[in-house]
Swiss-Prot record:
This is Maturase K. It is found in: Plastid, Chloroplast. The gene is matK. Usually encoded in the trnK tRNA gene intron. Probably assists in splicing its own and other chloroplast group II introns. Keywords: Chloroplast, mRNA processing, Plastid, RNA-binding, tRNA processing. It comes from Trillium flexipes.
Length: 521
């Protein structure tokens, strides 16, 4: 029902309504959409669980109506926010309502801000339909690129992207997407009224984005991604000016059309100016990869050149976004003895020495050669830490039961644990050492057994004796069964050495949940 109301509003006059989103703030169905668990997935980040505040649907509906009434009276809303700032740590009776109002305003406004972005993803009926390749959306598609390119490079800049900046700059970045001035004023008012909250640590560059408030995560992810999109637009533009050959991008820009319109205009205006500044940055073997708050800038150039890039990036953020990026957030490392954590893998460039026997007439001699190979392995210790955070084991890796699942049926419990194991095997199929996953599967197997034993008020030994030791055999699925999308399970030939073969799937569009625990740690 709420979706139909929103669609009807946007269909009245598409061009007019897209530029005038402010009335949606006063519509009750917007806040219903914001807290509908079925629509809680933003187009900018993976689904996140909304932290409950202890209210039921009936009482929350009344509070939403009261919030809308207060927003019509601006002074009343300001007093409510100020009252929350003063009493949130004192336990005041109004603290709950103020907390609820702040969460609802944040989530509701996030839904509204997403509308201009989501409309760009929906093709018009008049436009020519361009065939889409879903394979290019796969996370695994980046690893063959790294495997092909990084093994020939010398240095890498491991960048922890600084984040931001002054609140007003965040609003200014959104101006190119949202033409509705009242909505921008409302966002500016909301941010400045709550700038002293603990959940607004984004204005302190030394703080990690992991401290963002869970209540406001959806809104601040939009703000953060708009900032990253703006910085990458400027960075890619300057990079293209430093070399005459047109660079290509392997990632999908949400604003692809808008991006190229702006870059074509800027090239005509600023071409001569930037060529004089960036002449010493020419490097035909420069590659940039980013995921969330981390980026990799790899080069085949010398140490002096990569050091110049580091200095340039520090000044880049300072002069374009008006904040100081500390140099220690950018590390220079040679590929020969460096490994980095990226997308749930520990990646490195291995040097494999080999000797070749040569014969010339009657003389024999050996020629030593060195070859570089891009290698990816499963980070076992970090995965155990993720299992510990998810309450499957202790910090030392000792399996424990999952009490919250003990109320489910036996088939549901085994299905959940089995799905986790299959997803892990599927996602980490690109590892060159798959035997390390056996320890993870062992932890999940015993955790499942202890959860079943907890439900039946028994021990693991008695449970396995009663139900059979083959009950949990699916947790040790062989590799030839894991890669069943390519080779059917009825294959007549064994896949020898499959535990060493790396397979990159093209149907993975999001990082595994267990690997995702470590992205902002």
């Amino acid at each position: 029902m709420e979706e139909l109301q929103l669609q009807g509003y946007l269909e009245k006059d598409g061009s007019r309504q897209q530029n005038f989103l402010y009335p949606l703030i006063f519509q009750e169905y917007i806040y219903t959409l914001a807290h509908d668990h079925g629509l809680n997935s933003s187009i900018f980040y993976e689904p996140m669980e909304i932290v409950g505040l202890g209210y039921d649907n009936k009482s929350s509906s009344v509070l939403v109506k009261r919030l809308i009434t207060q927003m019509y009276q601006q002074n009343s809303l300001i007093y409510s926010m100020n009252d929350f700032n003063q009493n949130r740590f004192v336990g005041h009776n109004n603290s709950f309502y103020s907390n609820f109002y702040s969460q609802m305003v944040s989530e509701g406004f996030a839904v509204i801000v997403e509308i201009p972005f989501s409309l760009r993803l929906v093709p018009s009926s008049e436009e020519i339909q361009i065939p889409k390749s879903q394979n290019l959306r796969s996370i695994h598609s980046i690893f063959p690129f790294l495997e092909d390119k990084l093994s020939h490079l010398n240095y890498v800049l491991d960048i922890l992207i600084p984040y931001p900046i002054h609140l007003e700059i965040l609003v200014q970045i959104l101006q190119c997407w949202i033409q509705d001035v009242p909505s921008l004023h409302f966002l500016r008012f909301f941010l400045h009224e709550f700038h002293n909250w603990n959940n607004l640590n984004l204005i302190t560059p030394t703080k990690s984005i992991s401290v963002f408030s869970k209540e406001n995560k959806r809104l601040f992810w939009i703000l953060y991604n708009s900032y990253v999109s703006e910085y990458e637009f400027l960075f890619v533009f300057l990079r293209k000016q430093s070399y005459y050959l047109r660079s290509t991008s392997s990632r999908a820009f949400l604003e692809r059309t808008h991006f190229y319109v702006k870059i074509e205009h800027l090239i005509d205006v600023c071409h001569n100016h930037f060529q004089k500044i960036l002449w010493f940055f020419k490097d035909s073997f420069m590659h940039y990869v980013r995921y969330k708050g981390k980026a990799i800038l790899a080069s085949r150039g010398t140490y002096l050149l990569i050091k110049k890039w580091k200095c340039y990036l520090v000044n880049f953020w300072q002069y374009n976004f008006h904040f100081w990026s500390k140099p220690y957030r950018i590390h220079i490392n040679p590929f020969s003895n460096y490994s980095f954590y990226f997308l749930g893998y520990i990646s490195s460039v291995l040097i494999n020495p080999s000797a070749v026997k040569n014969q010339m007439l009657e003389n024999f001699y050996l020629v030593d050669t060195l070859t570089q190979k891009f290698d990816t392995i499963v980070p076992v210790i970090p995965l155990i830490g993720s299992l510990s955070k998810a309450k499957f084991c202790t910090i030392l890796g000792h399996p424990i039961s999952k009490p919250i699942w003990a109320e489910l049926s036996d088939s549901d419990i085994m299905d959940r644990f089995g799905r986790i194991c299959r997803n892990l095997s599927h996602y980490h199929s690109g590892s060159s050492k798959k035997q390390s996953l056996y320890r993870i599967k062992y932890i999940l197997r015993l955790s499942c057994a202890r959860t079943l034993a907890r439900k039946h008020k028994s021990t693991v030994r008695n449970l396995l004796q009663r139900l059979g030791s083959g009950l949990l055999e699916e947790f040790f699925t062989e590799e030839e069964q894991v890669i069943s999308p390519i080779f059917p399970k009825t294959t007549l030939f064994p896949l020898h050495g499959s535990h060493r073969e790396r397979i990159w799937y093209l149907d993975i569009i999001r990082i595994n949940d267990l690997a995702n625990y470590l992205d902002w740690s």
